[in-house]
Amino acid sequence: MRNSFPQFIFNRFRKNEAQLHELTYLFWECTLRCNLNCRHCGSDCSADSTAKDLPFDDFLRAILPLQKAYKKNSITIAITGGEPLMREDLPQCGRLLRENGFLWGMVTNGYGYTPEIHGKLLAAGMGSVTLSLDGLESSHNWLRANGQSFARAVQALDLIAAANHLVYDVVTCVNGRNIGELEAVMEFLIARKAKAWRLFTISPIGRAAGNEDMSLRPEQLKRLMDFIAQARADGRIQVTFSCEAYLGKYERKVRDSYFFCRAGIQIASVLTDGSISACPNIDRSFVQGNIYRDDFLEVWNNRFEVMRDRRWTKTGICKGCDAYKNCDGGALHLWDEKRDAIMSCIHQQLNPSRQSEPASYS
């Protein structure tokens, strides 16, 4: 595969970013409790989770040293779960983050997002929010396993879309059930004055592992990419594909930039048990330390080598792939503790003739 000059330059940029590893985005997995029981949950969360919430004081104490290493407001804390709104102290946590020089936002399913909590979060300095809406009513309620979840998410969308100066997007997990209604979902979002829409596929992890209803066939993946490319060309709403995979000829057509898995390079996380990792949905074998025994900044500066030098990913179907120099082993959440083969490859499914080795999934 011959690279374009822009792709070549971007590959150099990606290597340089891995060497610099400046932290810009920090997930706080504040709870594993959730008010839904979604069929595709990568963290296997539930309302009766026995895992304790991570105390905010412990989290704040761990990240305060970042103030000396980074400029004020240069790091965004993305609060996730579980469902962050299960924590009654969420507005207070957000306010203290802002007072200590951190931007913050949250990822929510919208089920508990009421006008009252919306006002409290804005007053606490919330600057960004990601809201899940997984299709039209029937499809969304099926995936979320709750007959009221769509109505609650739409209420949240209306509140969020009406807020001035709030950065937000709506995310949709595309699956075999909702792939045929993307056009209708887009029209729905435009009618509700949504400005940004990000689409994901569902990875074979957590509850989605082994569930064929969650995955897309190659022809459906192509349909998804063509839809996004056309929607971006039309320009009626800002539509992007997620950062989950290298896409070959669809690069820059469905995203603003080339594929770059920034886990452990610019993205870190503190999980509910205090573990220090990258994106919360990657395998726990990638954990680099724990705030209860390690200094977070020291861990960030001196560990994470497995994420910053990914030559170990050149195995399995990646070993002979002619797109490897652009992909660098794909997204880390698609590698398990064995690390002997990527679990799924969208590029291979979109371009089966470009793969020099037969598929072999773990």
Regions found by a protein language model. Give the residues of each.
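Conserved alpha-helical substructure of the radical SAM core
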Residues: R2-S128
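Cys/His-rich metal-chelating microdomains
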Residues: R33, N37, C41-D44, G264, ...
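Flexible mid-to-C-terminal extensions adjoining Fe-S/redox cofactors in radical SAM and related proteins
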Residues: F8-F13, E17-E22, N281-S362
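Conserved, mostly hydrophobic/aromatic
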Residues: C34, G274, F296
